[in-house]
C-alpha cells in the first residue's frame, strides 16, 4: 500500500532494514521502493513523506500459503496555542490482525504508539498492541531524530521493531517514543500559528494464519511520561500491567491502550484526576474533555454461542462528569456479555479488574476465559515528565482448526484533511467457521484540558477554526484537535467502522465557493480493494452497509465468504446497488433485524463515508476498522472520540447511559427488541443532531457522479455519531421512546425533528449540534493519497465573512437559541444482531440518516465542534444500547425469516431507494439554498459592520477638526508673542557683542605688555643658571676621568697576575701527570718482559717433551710393522691391527691438540689476570685525566671570562673617551654661543634671543657624564 502526500512533500527519511525468512534468507528493504507482491517474497516499504509520516508495508507471501502485509502508521496532528503554550498531539494507529488456517506460526507483536498532549509539558502517550502471526522473522530498528521546525523543542522519534520468529512464536515489538517539551511543532507542516500539521500516515496489515492451536501473544508496553497528580493517589505512578487472555475457541478481541495525560485548566497547570474508589486505586479522568482511556478488551465466543465480550465497567464519580473512552467502547462490547454474565470471575475465583492505565475501568471476563494480570510499577523521570508508566498487556488466544480468516487492512489519513481510507482486499473461497480477529486501534485523539467552570453559552465542545488560535485555552474545553474516522473494511470476514472526529481546519483563506467533489480513485489495486464489497446475497444485503453523512457504517453479512477477489472487481459496479441496499436496510432492518440475524454470517463490513464539509481543509472523517461481529471496536473507538466532551453536562450524560447499560437496561429491552431499537433510534435522534452547512450538502450532492456516486451514495444515509448521550436530554428521549415503541422507522424519522427541536429549545442545542466541518463526505477508497481531502473537490471553501457571521451564530448557539432554522442529520444507530447460532455473528443495523442542517452554521466554530462531539456521543450511546437490544432480539427471535418477510424487505428496499433519491435531491437543493442565504447574510453583515464603522469614524473626525481649529487659534497668538520677544533679544544680543569685542582688544594689549616684561626677566635668569651648571659639569667630568683611569690600571694588573698564576699551576699539574704516566708505563713493560720469558721457557719444555714422544711413537711403529710382517698370513688380524694403529694415531693427534689447547688456556688465564690489573690501572688513570681536564676547562673558562671582562673594560674606556671628546666639543660650542650671546643680548628681539637656549643637545648632554662606567 502506497500513500501519496501531495501537499506535504518533505524529504523522505530513507531507511533500509533487513528481514529474514524462515529459510534464513535476508532481504534488504528500501523505504522508497514500492510494495511488491510475489510468491515466496517479502517486502517492506518504509515511506516517509514527513518526519512524522511513517508507513511500513510489510508483505510476505512465502511458498507456504502465508501472507503478511504490515503497515504501521503513525500520525501526529497538532494544534498549538502560543498564548497558552499548549499543544495537542494526537496520533492513531490501527492494526488489524486476522489469523488464517493456512499458516501455523503464532506471533507475538507489540506495537507501542505514544501520544502526547502537551501543555506545560504533559505528554500523551497512546500504546497500541497488535497480535499477529507472521511467518518471517522481522527485525526493524530505525532511529529517527525529528527536529521540529519553528520550535527549539525536538521530537525524538525512536522506533524499534523487533520480531523474532520460530515455528512457534513470533515477536514483533514496536517502540515509538516521542519526547516533547512545552510546545511541539511537527517539521514541515505545522506553522507556529496553530495550523494542524499535514502529516500523513498509513497503516496496512494483513495476515493469513491458522492452526489447530494458534496462539496470539500481544504484549503492550506503555511509557507514560506524564505524571498524574491525583488528590487520592500518589502522582506520577508508573505501572507495568500485563494482560493475558486465553481462548480455546474463536476469540475476537480488541486491545486499545492509550495513555493520555489529562490536563486541568487550573493555573498550576497540573493534571487533576479523581478516583471513584480510593481502594481500587484507579484513576478516573476528571475532565470535561475526556482523554482516551487505555483499555484492554478481549472477546471470546464458544463454539456453540455467539461472540461474548469481556468489557470494562466505567466507575463514575458522584457527578458522573468524568467519562472514559473505554466506557463508550465497552458498552457495546459489554451489552451481550451483560445479558448473560453479570459477574464473571477470572480464573473462576475473582472478577478481574483490569486497570486501564490509571483509569477506573474493570474488565470482567467470562469464567471460560482465563486472564492473568501482573503489574509492575516503576518510576522514570524524563525531561519535564515526572513519571513513566510501563504497561504490558499480553493476549493469548487460540483459534479452532480449519478456520481461515482473510483480512487486509489499509488505513490512510492526512493530518490536514483528516481522511482515513482503508482497504480490505482478501476473499477466501474456503468457508470460514468462525472469524478470529484481534484489532488493536489507537485513535489519534488528543487529550484536552478540563474546565470545571465552562464559559457562559459554551457548554459544548469548542472547535478551533482560526489558525492563530489552534489550541483552546485551558479554561476553555478543547477537543481532540484531530479525531480520525477510519474506514476499514476488514477482509472478507469482518468490516468495522471506527469514527474519529478531527478538529476543524483554519478558514483564514477560505473562499466562498461551493466545489463539487471529484471521484477519488485508488491508485493501487489494493486501494480499489478497499471499496465496500458488494453483497453477493440479497437476503443479507439489507444490512450490508450503513451509510451516514459523516460516516457510513456498513455491516455486511458474511454470506460472501466464498467470494474471491472477483467480488472486489464487482465493487465499483455494485456501488449503486450497495447504496440502495444501505437505504433499504436502514428502513427495514429495524423490524426484520431479529429474523435476519439468524441468517447472517459473522462477517460485518464497515464502509466509512466521510462527508465533505465547508471546511477549507476538509475535516477528517476517518473510520477505524472494527470487527462488526463484536461491534466493540465501534464502541471503543466511539468512546475514544466522543470522550472529548468538555462541558460537565456532556460528561454526565455520557456516564449515566453507561451505568444504565450495565444493568438496568437489560430488563426493559429484552421484552420488546424492536421497540427498544425504535426507542434507541429516537433517543439517538434526540441526542444526535448534526448541523451541516450548505456547503456540506452541496458537496454531497455533487459527489454522486460515476465512481463518485460510489463514494457519495452512503452520504445520504445517516450520520454515524459516537454515542455520548446527555443526562439532561435523557428524560425527554425516554418519553419519546415510550411514545414511539410501536412505530416503524418512518414514524421515527417523522418524530425525530420534533425531538431535535425540543432538545434544542430546551437549551442544549449546542451540545447536540456537531461541527459541519468536522465531517467530510469521503469515500472509503481514499487511500490513494494522504492529501486527497485537500483536493478542491473534497473541500468546501468558505468565505472569510462567513466566518465572521459564524461568530454571531456561535454566540446564538451558545446562548441556547433554538429559533434558527435547523436542518440536522440524524441517524439510527447500527444495531448488532447477536445470534445464538453456531455462526455467532454480530450484525450491525445500518444507520438511518436524517438531514437536518442548520442554515447558518457553516463556519467551523467551537460550539459547532461541541455539537459534533455531543452528537457523536449520542450516536455511540445509541449504538451501545442497540447491540444489547439487538442481542435481546436475537435471543428472543432467532428464527429464520419467512419468505414473506423477504418480499417485504425487497419492497422496503425499493421504497428506500426512491426515498433516498428524493432525499439526496432535497439535500442538494438545501445545500444550494443554504450557500446562497449564507452568502447574503455574510455580505449584509459585512456591509452593516462597515457602515457602522464609517459612521463612528465620521463622528470622531468631526470632533477632532473642531479641536484642531481651537488649537490653531491659540498657536497663532503664541507665535506672535514669541516673535516680539525674539526681536528684543536680538537687539540686546548685538549690543552685548560689541561691548565684548571692545573689552577683548583692551585685555589683549595689556597681556602682551605683561608677558614681554616677564620674558626678558626669565631669559636673564636662565643664562646665569646655565653658566653655573656648565662649571659644575666640567668639574665632575674631570673627577670621573681620573677615577676611571686609576680603576682601569688596577684591574689590568690584577688580571695579569691571575693569568700567570693559572699558567704556573697548569704546567705543574701537567708535569706531574706525565711523570706518573711514564712510571706506570715502565712497570707494565717490565711485567710484559717477565711474562714473555716465562712463556718461552714453557714452550721449550713442551718441545722437548714432544720430541721424546715422537721418538716413542717411532719405536712403536717399528714394532708394529714387525708384528704386521709376522702376521701377514692372517688378513683379518692385519686389518684389525691397521685399525688399531689408525685409532692410536688419531688419539695421539687429539691428545696433542688437547695439550695445545690447555697451554693456550693457561696463557689466556694469565693474560686475563694481567689484563684485569691493567684495566684497573687504566680506569684510575682515565679518571685522573678527566679530573685534570675538568681543571683545565675551569681554568680556560676563568681565562675567557677575564678576557671578556677585559674587552668590556676596553670598550667602556673607548666610550668614555668618546664621551669626553663630545663633551669637550659641546663645551666649546657653548662657550662660543655664550660669548656671542653676551655681546648682542641687550639689542636682540624676543624671537632671536630665544634661539641659543633651544639647543636640544644641551639638556640631554649635561647629565650624561654623571653615569659611571662601572
UniProtKB/Swiss-Prot annotation:
Domain of life: Eukaryota
Keywords per UniProt: Cell cycle, Cell membrane, Coiled coil, Golgi apparatus, Membrane, Mitochondrion, Nucleus, Phosphoprotein
Biased composition (Low complexity): 39-50, 200-211, 538-547
Residue numbers carrying Phosphothreonine: 186
Residue segments, region Disordered: 1-50, 183-217, 374-402, 524-558, 592-622, 701-816, 1237-1270
Comp. bias (Acidic residues): 1-14
Stretches of the chain forming a coiled coil according to its record: 940-1231
Ranges of Polar residues composition bias in the record: 386-396, 701-710, 759-776, 797-816, 1244-1270
Location within or outside the cell: Mitochondrion; Golgi apparatus; Cell membrane; Nucleus
Disulfide bridge positions per record: none
Modified residues (Phosphoserine): 386, 399, 443, 629, 1203, 1224, 1245, 1255, 1259, 1261, 1264, 1268
A Gene Ontology cellular-component term: nucleus
One GO MF term attached to the UniProt entry: microtubule binding
GO biological process, one term: regulation of macrophage chemotaxis
Job description of the protein: Cooperates with AGTR2 to inhibit ERK2 activation and cell proliferation. May be required for AGTR2 cell surface expression. Together with PTPN6, induces UBE2V2 expression upon angiotensin-II stimulation.
Family per record: Belongs to the MTUS1 family.
PANTHER family listed in its UniProt record: MICROTUBULE-ASSOCIATED TUMOR SUPPRESSOR 1, TOUCAN, ISOFORM A
Subunit and partners: Homodimer. Interacts with AGTR2. Interacts with PTPN6. Associates with microtubules.
Protein name in the entry: Microtubule-associated tumor suppressor 1 homolog
Organism encoding this protein: Pongo abelii (Sumatran orangutan)
